[in-house]
């Protein structure tokens, strides 16, 4: 996430290098690996959640030098040895301390239970405990935790009090004023003109806070809601709570679309004011560190600097009835159409209404957009260049809903889906699954339509499968060169959601083609996000034994536990490793609770290949959690847990 807050501070006078000298006396810091006198000579990194019985399973030994005669033993919960083997060949060095990473093949371990790995020989090390369990059991809990994160993100009156002691918030959103598009300077740091009211009042209360802040975006909410609905359609593993949370997201999107005036609203709240430090006449959401209900308690009048923090502005995608940026039109239409598919059997009346809204939104798509798509204000919060994938997604889901409801427009929508798929394949904005690219979801569902011999489409099922393969080949090529087999780029933002996106795409590819070639790659990507990485941390809060305790998230910091136990932001997915050089400056507010309580960064000893990780409340670069991050992870876990996702023999 690139929503930079004001008030940055340095880590220490000596930066990251200085923190490394201090961490070896810190035994209570998260991820410290019980460092006492210096870095351990070797560590074992493993997926701390675990593996399904039939998956390929790898752990990693990271040591100060390659070892050729080391062995490993796997022990069960009673300490009995159940598996042994030799340490594999080195996959490469990591940093100046750890010059070798070697694989430990655990694939023969298939009996459900709790296990740990011990390495003996020239170096010794022991892994955290991990589990072997059926896919539905293993990933079902992770899905439920992801849903809990969304419960903690709720805004408005319908909050979940057991999630971080949440209280109703931003109730003034029930009577919100609509403003014209805000004007920012060239660097998108400050407003250059007062906001101009153009409409309202309208009710935009509810929904989810976008990340660790309190802004709400149609761009991210539609992606997250569509992902939850896709997951709900895929497997019952998420249960009633997943369905309820998906409906919560859809209900807010319904408020953001005025079907009568044909107006799509895209944002609630102001992310940047008229100064970069919050000292001006117009202050923004990012200028204070507080609980969301504190905004409701503000006593303000028009013209007060904090007026727009309580009485939050609403911005439109376009004036009423005018063409809408196609990325938004396609994605929001897809979300309503997914809901229509789920409602078709039990609530056909509501399903027809949802499909009509999808069709109305889709019909307003501006298919000759300018250089900048509408995502957020300022645009730099969520830059995006791809839109043909969104149009394919919208048409595909409308066609599937049309099939379920026997709608006469189904063939036309199928044709449009094929058209936009072809345009996407010919574009120069090809990406992989995540907030900025939904082609993998669109391709997988369009392939289902083509399986039904849909006439008149401009693409073939094989072309769609080839593009899924293209996305996976990009990641698997990187993984083949990475010591921990990471397919994501961990020197830039969104490394963890990117890894989850690759894992989900591999599952979709298997479903479309029946080809299990990328199954092991998918498992490796999930393993990396859950602890089988250089830092030995899971990047899903509450998953595994070591995970972020100090996310940059205001309710988690101000109302939650800071030691990883009790009331935490369970299920939230963080950005994960980023370029180490980006961690020199952290966010700071006087009202932040200090986290961690000890000085230094115990993870710095494990930085390498340009990547760094820090668990610090001010480290938005690595531990800010976000709705879209978590939605992508939930989608990946769902596809892994689904009964139709056949486990393959690791041999």
Question: Model features per residue range: what roles?
Answer:
Residues 1-15:
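N-terminal export and membrane-targeting signals
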Residues 3-5, 19-37:
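C-terminal region of N-terminal signal peptides and the immediate post-cleavage residues
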Residues 38-49:
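Short, compositionally biased P/S/T/A/G/V-rich stretches that sit at domain boundaries
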Residues 48-123, 136, 146-222, 230-231, ...:
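Aromatic (Trp/Tyr) and acidic
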Residues 230-248, 270-274, 312-320, 338-354:
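Short coil/linker segments at helix-helix boundaries
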Residues 242-263, 267-270:
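Carboxylate/His-rich catalytic cores and anion/metal-binding grooves
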Residues 329, 333-343, 351-402, 424, ...:
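Aromatic-lined, polymer-binding surfaces characteristic
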């Amino acid at each position: 996430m690139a929503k930079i807050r004001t008030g940055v501070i340095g880590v220490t006078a000596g930066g990251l290098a200085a923190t490394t000298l201090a961490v070896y006396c810190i035994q209570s810091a998260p991820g410290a690996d019980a460092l006492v006198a210096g870095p351990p000579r070797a560590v074992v990194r493993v997926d701390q959640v675990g593996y399904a019985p039939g998956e390929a399973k790898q752990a990693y030994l990271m040591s100060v030098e390659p070892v050729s005669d080391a062995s490993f033993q796997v022990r069960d919960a009673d300490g009995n040895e159940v598996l042994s083997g030799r340490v594999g060949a080195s996959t490469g060095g990591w940093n100046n301390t750890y010059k070798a990473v070697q694989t430990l093949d655990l694939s023969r371990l298939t009996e459900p239970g709790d296990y740990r790995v011990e390495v003996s020989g020239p170096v010794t090390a022991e892994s955290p405990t991990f589990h072997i369990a059926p896919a539905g059991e293993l990933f079902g809990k992770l899905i439920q935790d992801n849903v809990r994160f969304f419960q903690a993100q709720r805004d408005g009156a319908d909050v979940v009090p057991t999630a971080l002691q949440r209280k109703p918030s931003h109730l003034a959103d029930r009577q919100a004023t609509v403003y014209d598009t805000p004007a920012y300077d060239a660097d998108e740091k400050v407003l250059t003109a007062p906001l101009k009211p153009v409409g309202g009042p309208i009710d935009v209360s509810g929904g989810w806070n976008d990340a660790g802040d309190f802004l709400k975006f149609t761009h991210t909410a539609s992606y997250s809601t569509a992902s939850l609905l896709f997951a709900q359609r895929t497997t019952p593993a998420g249960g009633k709570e997943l369905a309820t949370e998906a409906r919560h997201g859809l209900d807010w999107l319904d408020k953001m679309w005025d079907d009568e005036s044909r107006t799509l609203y895209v944002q609630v709240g102001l992310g940047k004011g008229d100064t970069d430090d919050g000292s001006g006449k117009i202050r923004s959401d990012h200028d204070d560190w507080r609980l969301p209900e504190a905004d409701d308690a503000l006593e303000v009048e028009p013209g007060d600097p904090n007026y727009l923090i309580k009485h939050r502005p609403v911005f439109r995608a376009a004036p009423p009835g005018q063409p809408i940026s196609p990325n938004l039109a396609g994605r929001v239409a897809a979300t309503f159409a997914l809901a229509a598919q789920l409602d078709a059997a039990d609530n056909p009346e509501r399903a027809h209404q949802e499909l009509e809204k999808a069709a109305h939104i889709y019909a307003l798509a501006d298919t000759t957009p300018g250089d900048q798509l509408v995502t957020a204000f300022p645009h730099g919060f969520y830059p995006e260049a791809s839109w043909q994938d969104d149009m394919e997604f919208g048409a595909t889901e409308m066609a599937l809903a049309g099939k379920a409801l026997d709608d006469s427009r189904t063939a036309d929508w199928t044709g449009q889906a094929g058209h936009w798929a072809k345009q996407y394949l010919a574009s120069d904005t090809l990406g992989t699954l995540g907030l900025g690219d939904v082609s993998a979801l669109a391709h997988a569902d369009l392939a289902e339509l083509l399986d039904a011999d849909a006439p008149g489409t401009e693409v073939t099922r094989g072309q769609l499968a080839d593009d899924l393969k293209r996305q996976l080949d990009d990641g698997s090529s990187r993984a083949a060169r990475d010591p921990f087999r990471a397919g994501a780029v961990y020197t830039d933002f969104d490394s963890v959601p990117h890894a989850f996106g690759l894992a989900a795409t591999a599952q979709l590819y298997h479903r479309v083609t029946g080809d299990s070639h990328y199954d092991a790659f998918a498992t490796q990507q999930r393993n990396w996000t859950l602890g089988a990485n250089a830092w030995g941390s899971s990047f899903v809060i509450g998953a595994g034994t070591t995970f972020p305790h100090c996310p940059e998230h205001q309710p988690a910091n101000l109302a939650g536990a800071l030691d990883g136990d009790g009331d935490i932001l369970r299920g939230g997915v963080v950005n994960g490793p980023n370029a180490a050089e980006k961690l020199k400056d952290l966010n700071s507010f006087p009202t932040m609770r200090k986290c961690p309580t000890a000085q230094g960064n115990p993870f710095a000893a494990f930085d390498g290949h340009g990547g760094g990780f820090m668990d610090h409340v001010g480290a938005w670069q690595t531990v800010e959690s976000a709705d879209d991050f978590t939605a992508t992870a939930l989608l990946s876990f769902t596809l892994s847990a689904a009964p139709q996702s056949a486990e393959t023999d690791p041999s």
